[in-house]
Regions:
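A short helix-loop-beta-strand connector motif used in the catalytic cores of GNAT acetyltransferases and
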Residues: 73-87
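Short, hydrophobic secondary-structure boundary micro-motifs
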Residues: 53-55, 83, 197-198
Length: 200
């Protein structure tokens, strides 16, 4: 399960309410919120260990039933303004990737987990996707802090996170849904750091 960032920020009541509203209102042509129609496609993608093995917070075992529950749970959290599970579709309308934004509105903070279908990995689109997701969390959701983790041996994700300008802050224990833990690399970035890095 996700844990809020190590660095503690306190949102004002107005900021917290705005973040919750932004999460609840997200979606549209450019951002497809996962629904029942995506269960089979997500299951097929996540059943591939090349996709799912590095990700600690996926439902296990990966079955259509567990993925359907995960989508339902994510939607319930979206209605509270605390989570957003989205899918990327390819030209044929098949699930090509997913992103799950976990949001702590009271902390003005968020994290993202996600993956691309195995046949689309190493296509150099990962860094662009990370940049889009960062912009979305800061500009659309309105959080002031993003925290990210990656498995110690997940070289590809670590390289993308480093390249995006996140600060490495050591290691943390990530807790899986079954209660077991995984040692993870840990990064943070503030909105101010992102603005400085990306100012034209």
């Amino acid at each position: 399960m996700s844990a809020p960032p190590v660095t503690v920020l306190q949102a004002t009541p107005q900021e917290e309410a705005a973040i919750r509203a932004a999460v609840r209102g997200a979606g549209g042509d450019d951002l497809v919120v996962a629904g029942p129609q995506h269960v089979a496609g997500l299951t097929a993608m996540l059943a591939d260990p090349r996709v799912s093995d590095p990700i600690y917070d996926l439902p296990r075992p990966i079955t259509e039933e567990s993925v359907a529950r995960w989508i339902e749970q994510s939607e319930a959290l979206r209605q509270k303004g605390e989570c957003l599970l989205t899918v990327a579709l390819d030209e044929a309308g098949e699930v090509a990737g997913y992103s799950r934004f976990t949001v702590w509105p009271e902390r003005s903070a968020a994290e993202i987990a996600g993956a691309r279908r195995a046949d689309l990995q190493n296509s150099h689109a990962g860094k662009a996707g990370v940049a889009r997701s960062i912009a979305f969390m800061f500009e659309v959701l309105g959080v002031r802090m993003i925290a990210l983790t990656a498995a110690l041996d997940n070289v590809r994700s670590a390289a993308s996170i480093d390249a995006a300008g996140f600060r490495r802050m050591g290691e943390v224990d990530s807790v899986r849904p079954d209660g077991t833990t995984r040692r993870s690399l840990y990064w943070e970035m503030t909105r101010e750091e992102w603005v400085r890095t990306h100012r034209l």
